[in-house]
Amino acid sequence: VFGAFLALTQMPSGLAAVACASLALLKSGDEVLIPDNAYGPNKALTEGELAAWGITHQYYDPLDVADLAARINERTHLVWLEAAGSITLEFPDLIEQVRLCRARGVTCVLDNTWGAGLAFNPFDLDGQGLGVHVSVHALTKYPSGGGDVLMGSVVTRDAALHLKLKLTHMRMGYGIGVNDVEAVLRSLPSLPLRYAAHDRAARELARWLADREEVAQVLHPALEGSPGHAHWKALCGPTDLAAGLFSIVLHERH
């Protein structure tokens, strides 16, 4: 899966996959760093359950690697990454973020739902094997495709991390039904075609909206002027793919 050797795909949802990663890799007294545009339920989990269990957190600017570097300290045991960010779709310099985490000895976990393993390879970001430690994915979205299945995955190349994740997965009692598995497996062969079709349609609509007088800004990583566009181009240029998600900012008068 996504070029990784070890995978846990029996997650009942994408959020369950996120929770499994945080619960497996953090303990009381640790600190986790999260981008300020992270998936909302991940923030809620961090501010709620994790905080109650003595795990602190800081939010960092995903477009400023120096800000992330300044926040890493001796208590930092996990850095969450998102490319692109949730809702506002800023695209970070993911390569430099991962280089920083590895240089500082901090585990980094990517929410790779947006890229779906197609826009870029999270385990080979630079063509030379630089990759995240763990990639989580809401299979509910693009892999399922039908909107009728909840499922998630956690993927790693690290055997020690895989064991931690596997034990947490077992202790939390995560499981999924065989019918849901069948539905996702049936949809996987068409995933590349569907993802590309979503991308084409979204870009066409985004460009149309960009010319509307009501629209102040279109937030789409593949469009020039969108925050982090250069980072998207550097990372996803070989595939020229982007998900079918974008946001718009309306002028106040509208």
Language-model regions, residue ranges each:
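Conserved small-domain helix->loop->beta segment predominantly found in fold-type I
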Residues: 203-254
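Conserved PLP-binding active-site segment in aminotransferase class I/II-type PLP enzymes
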Residues: 1-3
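Conserved PLP-enzyme active-site core in the AAT-like
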Residues: 5-214, 219
